[in-house]
């Protein structure tokens, strides 16, 4: 994949070249999208819109930490949707990981989550965030145990994952209407990088074959059901719904 690669660390140790080789990235000086290695983290920037700032994954501080400490925990809609109840903490495959927010919420309340991400740049951002999270004294021990990244396309990986999870979680990219600054910023950068999930409808059937108990699909409230497959079961929040489909018992 072509992207502009920028090293702002000043270290001169070739770490960016190693990272590019690992994720199959080729430097393109004219590309408006840039993957930037700073001394603190890896960032994705849209060079023709510098005011948007950098997109990065941070499980330790900022919004993720606030959500972990002060969010709803088990009461969050995503936790209810995957079926967390009492001592039951399902094994989850998040087949459209993105920046890992929902996967992190599930891991923070005790679920073991395997994240799938096919875009190499997004996977690199996730991997960088995980590496820093794993080193953190407070969350590192349980994060290492509960949250893992698999760089693969869900369309193929969902046929081959073992052991089978209790739940497959899907949150395909869908054009957002919301006007919040964060969503606008992230979606503009993300959609410039990866575009819409045009093949997302093809995920539901393999997800239902893989999941032992259920498949959960997060949708904006104005979006049709994935693949136009309606379900009467959903957890509904302001702005979103989590459609729930049966899996395939072991």
From Swiss-Prot:
Specifically methylates the guanosine in position 1516 of 16S rRNA. InterPro entries: 16SrRNA_methylTrfase_J, SAM-dependent_MTases_sf. Belongs to the methyltransferase superfamily. RsmJ family. It comes from the Bacteria. GO terms for cellular component: cytoplasm. It catalyses: guanosine(1516) in 16S rRNA + S-adenosyl-L-methionine = N(2)-methylguanosine(1516) in 16S rRNA + S-adenosyl-L-homocysteine + H(+). HAMAP family: 16SrRNA_methyltr_J (MF_01523). This is Ribosomal RNA small subunit methyltransferase J. PANTHER family: RIBOSOMAL RNA SMALL SUBUNIT METHYLTRANSFERASE J (PTHR36112:SF1). S-adenosyl-L-methionine binds at residues 101-102, 117-118, 153-154, 171. It is an enzyme of class 2 (transferase). CDD domains: AdoMet_MTases. Disulfide bonds: none annotated. It comes from Cronobacter sakazakii (strain ATCC BAA-894) (Enterobacter sakazakii). It is found in: Cytoplasm. SUPFAM superfamilies: S-adenosyl-L-methionine-dependent methyltransferases (SSF53335). Keywords: Cytoplasm, Methyltransferase, rRNA processing, S-adenosyl-L-methionine, Transferase. Its EC number is 2.1.1.242. NCBIfam families: PRK10742.1. GO terms for molecular function: rRNA (guanine-N2-)-methyltransferase activity. Transmembrane segments: none annotated.
